[in-house]
A protein has these predicted regions:
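Short secondary-structure capping micro-motifs at structural edges
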Residues: 145-151, 183-188
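Short glycine-rich beta-strand segments
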Residues: 164-167
Length: 244
């Protein structure tokens, strides 16, 4: 949920200092991931009208725009992108077992414990019900084919901060692990003495890299200050003195 908002209004609003707050709540609901929290409509082969682009036209046209990456001629969420969502499932629901709630089958849910009644798909965003789910990573297996998820503004702007929260998928895998790790056995990140970091790259209007900001989502490495995964929305300040 980019940039702080002091209200629960469902609009991208102009603040008193001239800055804009994007809440994701005034996006067209037809862009929402569904019909389940797996986000089947984010893929071309699931039999639903596919969503590949999300954008905000309030108060300006294409104030915010993000499109899924196209790899090998196919545009899919699995190739990297930002999905619009309001799902908030943090445990197995009726009929689900095992690691369902922290697998790709629940990849569009936010792990926001400030909402006591999970699964109602409302009020789980920072400023309302909706939020963006960022999917994209680089490792030894996919760096040759997955592009980085991107978002754009309609004109050059200074981004001052983001409200971030883990997805259920991310939180669960950090906490419990899954079989896709190097050992093939579900191992919590803490036991592996590992870390998980997100990088935010900022570019100018000509596509030149201005700066990369880094945020640790979890850190259990020896000799490092322990960082546990967040469970509510947390402000990530950037473009400020002393912020790395």
């Amino acid at each position: 949920d980019p940039v702080d908002s002091g209200t629960s209004q469902t609009r991208a609003v102009t603040n008193s200092d001239g800055s804009l707050t994007i809440t994701f709540d005034d996006f067209d609901p037809g862009m929402l991931a569904g019909p389940t929290s797996a986000g089947e409509n984010l893929y071309s082969y699931q039999g639903y009208p596919q969503v590949t682009t999300i954008y905000d036209n309030t108060p300006e046209e294409y104030l915010f725009l993000s499109m899924f990456n196209t790899v090998g001629g196919s545009t899919e969420y699995s190739s990297g992108g930002i999905a619009l969502s309001n799902w908030n499932i943090r445990s197995n629901q009726s009929g689900n077992t095992g690691d369902w709630w922290y697998s790709y089958l629940n990849q569009c849910s936010v792990y926001n414990t400030a909402v006591e009644a999970e699964g109602q798909n409302k009020e789980a965003g920072h400023s309302g019900s909706s939020f963006g789910v960022v999917y994209g990573y680089v490792d030894a297996y996919n760096q040759a084919w997955m592009a980085k998820p991107e978002f754009y503004f309609n004109v050059p702007r200074k981004l001052v901060g983001l409200w971030i929260c883990n997805t259920s998928y991310t939180y669960g895998v950090i906490t419990y692990g899954n079989q896709f790790g190097s050992t093939g056995v579900a191992t919590p990140l803490k036991e592996m003495k590992g870390y998980f970091q997100v990088n935010l790259e900022c570019y100018d209007a000509n596509g030149g890299l201005i700066r990369t900001y880094k945020r640790l989502l979890a850190d259990y490495r020896n000799g490092q200050q322990q960082v546990d995964p967040i469970t509510t929305w947390d402000y990530w300040e950037i473009n400020a003195e002393g912020v790395q």
